[in-house]
Amino acid sequence: MAIERTFSIIKPNAVAKNVIGNIFARFEAAGFKIVGTKMLHLTVEQARGFYAEHDGKPFFDGLVEFMTSGPIVVSVLESENAVQRHRDLLGATNPANALAGTLRADYADSFTENGTHGSDSLESAQREIAYFFGEGEVCPRTR
């Protein structure tokens, strides 16, 4: 099976809980290589652009407000079947439905403040990685 890349966000509520290291450790324990990462504080324009597919939906403004409420950590993860394996590790989008031991079961506060984001397809991963990472900011791991 080919190595894939996926995109991950540790959202403001999880950053505020000081669990970045715990989440990274779980990524690595699950076999992911972290090949790009940075912390940033989204502007309203960045958040609206990233979540543009949800513009017009009832939750959009609240999502933008939440995602700009504090710093986030964006990362590029690499492994076989990365997109699906990462989504499995995150758990259900609604933390009320997330299985025990998933990141959302452990770190989410609500449906909107669900602690983490993960790409839902390879196409989304490519688009989302390009949104936050420029040329040379993702470093393939060779060891």
Swiss-Prot record:
Its main location: cytoplasm. Homotetramer. It is an enzyme of class 2 (transferase). PROSITE patterns: NDPK, NDPK_LIKE. GO terms for molecular function: ATP binding; metal ion binding; nucleoside diphosphate kinase activity. The active site is at 117 (pros-phosphohistidine intermediate). This is Nucleoside diphosphate kinase. GO terms for biological process: CTP biosynthetic process; GTP biosynthetic process; UTP biosynthetic process. ATP binds at residues 11, 59, 87, 93, 104, 114. GO terms for cellular component: cytoplasm. Keywords: ATP-binding, Cytoplasm, Kinase, Magnesium, Metal-binding, Nucleotide metabolism, Nucleotide-binding, Phosphoprotein, Transferase. Pfam families: NDK (PF00334). It comes from the Bacteria.
